[in-house]
């Protein structure tokens, strides 16, 4: 099956869209989480566009100010223990003298991490990171692989994999067995993905560089080749990651969101058609835009009656959620989207994220 994907012509066109959700430790040189400290050099009224504020006040209502206060504050640093090379108890023993670790409820291998003497330390310089014992990964970014729940021996596709935080997490849950196809459209990002897979000891995978239409062609030419599970961590506007990258506000524009929504609908449809009967797909983004989230999922449900949107139980995950957006402007949104997991930065003091779990009914 790995050979089947390898024979396709490699697509050289690089993606112009980067996902902030997978970027490694890019926080400021301060551990101060206050909004005021972060905006010393960039006044808030200069940073935030009026049309951005108008749009989000309409979307969030009275929660807008809370959203902005969290979005303009620093994000807590996190690590995920890589069970392919180490274990939680071993990492605790190695780090506990210098670091304070706070468990992340929804991921048993995840921890918020702070330096005990209060000084800043780049987590990417830790020996445990270089050895692949840990992965520096934002807490909300750990949710999609947990919801996907890949099993050992399965055939799994990560459609937008680079640079690899979720991909290596999937491989860990698969216990390095089965087949993991890790795809991205960017050559430079694929190099980073390959390095992270090697560092983390992943050896059940193949790397592919294909745009989504190539997967569509594979599905048409090889109808018997299907995946047990697929993760579509789609390129998005990243408005849930403002606290990691303030430029997200400056880059925001409605036309770009509409364009991204079209790309996302194409990705989710192609991925759904690559699923085995009773297979599971997780669609996720690091934006809180309903046009990129609930509307994309609704598009799939409208087109495919055998697409079932499964409920993601926040109580089992130990996570707080914001109710799904069921009505916004002229978007066509199905009532079933209440089963999706919508997380705003102020819910759990993380990035904003959206996660949907979809099953292909037989």
Predicted features by range, described:
Residues 1-362:
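S-adenosylmethionine
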């Amino acid at each position: 099956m790995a050979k089947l994907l390898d024979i396709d012509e490699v697509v050289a066109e690089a993606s112009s869209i980067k996902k902030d959700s997978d970027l490694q430790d890019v926080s400021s040189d301060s551990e101060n989480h206050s909004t005021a400290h972060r905006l010393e050099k960039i006044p808030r009224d200069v940073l935030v566009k009026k049309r951005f504020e108008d749009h989000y006040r309409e979307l969030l209502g009275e929660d807008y100010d809370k959203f902005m206060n969290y979005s303009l504050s620093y994000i807590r640093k996190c690590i995920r223990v890589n069970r392919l090379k180490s274990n939680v108890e071993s990492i605790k023993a190695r780090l506990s003298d210098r670091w304070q670790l706070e468990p992340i409820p929804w991921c048993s291998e995840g921890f918020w991490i702070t330096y005990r003497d209060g000084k800043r330390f780049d987590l990417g310089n830790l020996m445990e990171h270089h050895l692949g014992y840990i992965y520096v990964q934002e807490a909300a970014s750990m949710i999609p692989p947990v919801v996907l729940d890949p099993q050992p021996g399965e055939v799994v596709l990560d459609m937008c994999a680079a640079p690899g935080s979720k991909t290596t997490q999937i491989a860990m849950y698969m216990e390095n067995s089965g087949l993991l196809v890790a795809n991205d459209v960017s050559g430079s990002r694929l190099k980073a993905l390959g390095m992270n897979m090697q560092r983390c000891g992943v050896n059940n995978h193949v790397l592919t560089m294909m745009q989504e239409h190539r997967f569509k062609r594979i599905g048409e030419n090889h109808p018997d080749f299907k995946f047990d599970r697929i993760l579509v961590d789609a390129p998005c506007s990243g408005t849930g990651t403002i606290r990691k990258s303030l430029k997200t506000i400056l880059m925001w524009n409605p036309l770009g969101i509409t364009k991204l929504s079209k790309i996302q609908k194409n990705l989710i449809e192609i991925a759904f058609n690559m699923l085995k009967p009773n297979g599971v797909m997780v669609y996720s983004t690091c934006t809180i835009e309903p046009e990129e989230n609930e509307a994309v999922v609704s598009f799939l449900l409208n087109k495919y009656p055998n697409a079932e949107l499964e409920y993601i139980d926040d109580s089992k995950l130990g996570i707080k959620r914001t109710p799904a957006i069921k009505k916004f402007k002229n978007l066509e949104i199905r009532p079933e989207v209440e089963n999706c997991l919508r997380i705003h930065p102020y819910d759990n003091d993380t990035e904003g994220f959206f996660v949907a779990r979809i099953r292909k009914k037989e």
